[in-house]
């Protein structure tokens, strides 16, 4: 058994990847599934679309690899975080669609919690801010809006879970109702200091404890899959939320090690070791993957519009035909010509947290070309990520000596060079950029003895290319100051319509 199977359940598609012992990809399969938008600001998934697409990709990846489930040493799961579902324990039937992490319907519940003065207590206990993003208010909304939901929960008839819990329930035909620390820490119900569900927060949200899954370390022998699904029973050895899994897949095992995922948005995580650092700079504190008995924590910040700015250049401005064309267009000019692009189409995320900020392109002149705007758009991804890393540096107890990167936009050399220039530290792209799935595979491997420990996994990590800063720190500081001035402009109260 020389292989590991990783399930990577994302927001728009499910994937499965077969890895060999060296952490190389042997085969992969992907399947998209429908998104449902019943009302503005609402986003839902059909739980069975998630399960069926995930199972189909597992079978397809094994077939493509010309391997069977019996050849797999273990199975690991990584998943879109916070997305919330509730199902009947007796039948496994969901009582409502999955409410997705992007869904904003619970803002009124969040506002009432803030009005009760719970914000500081929630931050202290969970590391999170009160926001519809996290699972707790989504769970409360389902219980409030499904007939008999709260009564059935009190009788122990219902189960709550994030996506990982739902997949394990299906894979084991309802034998296991579990999650891991990284997913639990995104619910706004898990006390990251005690490592337990928080009874006071459950009372505040009127959530019955019988709903909640058992929580285990991320690397743990959770149980066996039903043999009927894949032709043989597999040990479920790893579970982690997608961003923590990517941190693990990047072998960021020591305090001060950080990774940034450049996707539609950007997610930066910094390992803070066994300390849950309380952020004073607009970041959240979260559980990192736990592969042994010792707890591990991370600081996290997210950028709402990362690679999505390139999609806007393609679909909104029609400046490029394919997203990949942006690098050539941006490289057609030596710099942005003084143009700064602030892509706050949906407000600004960490560390600014300004939902009212609007997008802007500033510094335009008669000599501005589409090349300058494309370059400014790419640079905006690096500027926002720089603001995150600077906030982390202010919060963190250890210095950050390099940034490991992954995600689709990490293929863009111009972006990564500019990122290194702004940060003044090396930016490193690994050989295997499927780090999210790789993290789940590594966790499963450690749990089952396929790998000895984190040290063995760390030896496998290989850099593909390192980008070193080439501009002076004075020049970098000047560019960052220009960015912050542009951000200040989009955060001014709007005078439109007056």
Swiss-Prot record:
Q: Please provide, alphabetically and separated by semicolons, the GO molecular function terms listed in this UniProt record.
A: ATP binding; glycerol kinase activity
Q: Can you cite a GO biological process for this protein? A: glycerol-3-phosphate metabolic process
Cited PROSITE patterns? FGGY_KINASES_1 (PS00933), FGGY_KINASES_2 (PS00445)
Give the residues the record marks as binding glycerol: 81-82, 133, 242-243
Q: EC number(s) in its UniProt entry?
A: 2.7.1.30
Residues of the signal sequence?
A: none
Q: Which residues bind sn-glycerol 3-phosphate?
A: 11, 81-82, 133, 242
Please list the residues that bind ADP. Answer: 11, 15, 264, 307, 408, 412
Residues at which ATP binds: 11-13, 264, 307, 311, 408
Task: Say if the entry is tagged with keyword Cytoplasm.
Answer: no
Q: How is its activity regulated?
A: Inhibited by fructose 1,6-bisphosphate (FBP).
Biological or metabolic pathway of the protein: Polyol metabolism; glycerol degradation via glycerol kinase pathway; sn-glycerol 3-phosphate from glycerol: step 1/1
**Has keyword Cell wall biogenesis/degradation?**
no
Q: Which reaction does it catalyse?
A: glycerol + ATP = sn-glycerol 3-phosphate + ADP + H(+)
Q: Name one GO cellular component term.
A: cytosol
Arranged from A to Z, the UniProt key words for this protein are: ATP-binding, Glycerol metabolism, Kinase, Nucleotide-binding, Transferase
Enumerate the Pfam families for this protein.
FGGY_C, FGGY_N
Protein family according to the UniProt entry: Belongs to the FGGY kinase family.
NCBIfam families according to UniProt: glycerol_kin, PRK00047.1
Instruction: Tell me the function of this protein.
Output: Key enzyme in the regulation of glycerol uptake and metabolism. Catalyzes the phosphorylation of glycerol to yield sn-glycerol 3-phosphate.
> HAMAP family from the xrefs?
Glycerol_kin
Protein name as catalogued: Glycerol kinase
| Native species | Ralstonia pickettii (strain 12J)
What gene codes for this chain?
Answer: glpK
């Amino acid at each position: 058994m020389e292989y590991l199977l990783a399930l990577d359940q994302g927001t728009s598609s499910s994937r499965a990847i077969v890895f060999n012992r060296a952490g190389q990809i042997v085969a992969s399969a992907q399947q998209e599934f429908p998104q449902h938008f019943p009302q503005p600001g609402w986003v839902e998934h059909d739980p069975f679309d998630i399960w069926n697409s995930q199972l189909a990709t597992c079978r397809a990846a094994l077939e493509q690899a010309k391997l069977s489930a019996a050849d797999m040493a273990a199975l690991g799961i990584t998943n879109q975080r916070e997305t919330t579902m509730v199902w009947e324990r007796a039948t496994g039937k969901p009582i409502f669609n999955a409410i997705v992490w992007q869904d904003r319907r619970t803002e009124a519940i969040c506002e009432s919690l803030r009005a009760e003065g719970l914000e500081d207590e929630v931050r202290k206990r969970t590391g999170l801010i009160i926001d519809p993003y996290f699972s707790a208010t989504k769970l409360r909304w389902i219980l409030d809006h499904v007939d008999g939901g709260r009564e059935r929960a009190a009788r122990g008839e219902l189960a709550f879970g994030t996506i990982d819990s739902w997949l394990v329930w299906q894979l084991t035909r309802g034998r296991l109702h579990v999650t891991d620390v990284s997913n639990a820490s995104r619910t706004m119900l898990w006390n990251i200091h005690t490592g337990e569900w928080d009874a006071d927060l459950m009372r505040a949200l009127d959530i019955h404890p019988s709903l909640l899954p058992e929580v285990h370390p991320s690397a743990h022998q959770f149980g066996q899959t039903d043999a009927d699904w894949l032709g043989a029973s597999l040990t479920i050895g790893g579970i982690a939320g997608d961003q923590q899994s990517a941190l693990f897949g990047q072998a960021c095992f020591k305090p001060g090690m950080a990774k940034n995922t450049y996707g539609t948005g950007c997610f930066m995580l910094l390992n803070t070791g066994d300390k849950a650092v309380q952020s004073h700079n607009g970041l959240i504190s979260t559980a990192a993957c736990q592969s042994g008995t010792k707890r591990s924590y991370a600081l996290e910040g997210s950028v709402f519009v990362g690679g999505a700015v390139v999609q806007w250049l393609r679909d909104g401005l029609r400046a490029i035909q394919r997203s990949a064309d942006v690098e050539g267009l941006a490289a057609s000019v030596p710099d942005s010509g003084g143009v700064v692009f602030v892509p706050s189409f949906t407000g600004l995320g960490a560390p600014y947290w300004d939902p009212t900020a609007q997008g802007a392109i500033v510094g335009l002149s008669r000599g501005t070309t589409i090349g300058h705007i494309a370059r400014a758009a790419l640079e905006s991804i690096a500027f926002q990520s720089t603001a995150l890393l600077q906030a982390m540096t202010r919060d963190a107890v250890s210095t950050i000596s390099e940034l490991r990167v992954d995600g689709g936009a990490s293929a863009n050399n111009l972006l990564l060079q500019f990122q290194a220039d702004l940060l003044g530290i090396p930016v490193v792209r690994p050989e295997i950029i499927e780090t999210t799935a790789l993290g789940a595979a590594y966790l499963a491997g450690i749990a089952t003895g396929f790998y000895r420990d984190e040290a063995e996994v760390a030896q496998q990590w290989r850099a593909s290319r390192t980008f070193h800063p080439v501009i002076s720190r004075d020049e970098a500081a000047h560019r960052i100051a220009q960015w912050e001035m542009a951000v200040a402009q989009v955060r001014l109260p709007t005078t439109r319509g007056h």
